[in-house]
Amino acid sequence: IYTLSDGTKNIIDKLNQPITLKLYYAEKAAMKGPDKIRFFNIYYDFVKSLLEEYESVSDGMINLEVIDPRPYSEAETEALAHGLKKFPITEEENFFFGLVVQTQFGVEKTIPFFSPERQDFVEYDISYLIDTAITREKKKIGVVSSLPVTGQDVSDYMARMMRMQGQQPEPAW
């Protein structure tokens, strides 16, 4: 069992909608691959137990699905559609190891591949993914006008050059 950090628990506590964590791991493909790929079985067990801990402390707000994408299957097609990285092992088998976070409102965030170099940061990466999936993005607006509504955005150098020529940069309204 893995103990989650206080920051992760805070993110889980502020969940206002159920989310699904889809862990894609090509377990059968990994067994057919070279030793470097088989190493991922240990890393997979670590990530899976971590995600199970997320699920257990979430009061039913997190649903974990573990998916082994087999060749030419719907799961493999979904993994590719979500942007997960695939690594060919044999002519038939591809290796996948990634995560998709889905909200009930259709927001999807992805870790395309769990890199061993980021193993020390995997809890942070997952928590960040969940937080960005459930946090509404602020809307961005733009101003389109032929009038100098926002003023002239010029560098200090350009402002000096304009002053030398007797011109003044336009201030914002």
Where are these regions (language model features)?
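Short, surface-exposed patches at the edges or C-terminal ends of soluble domains, predominantly
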Residues: 1-173
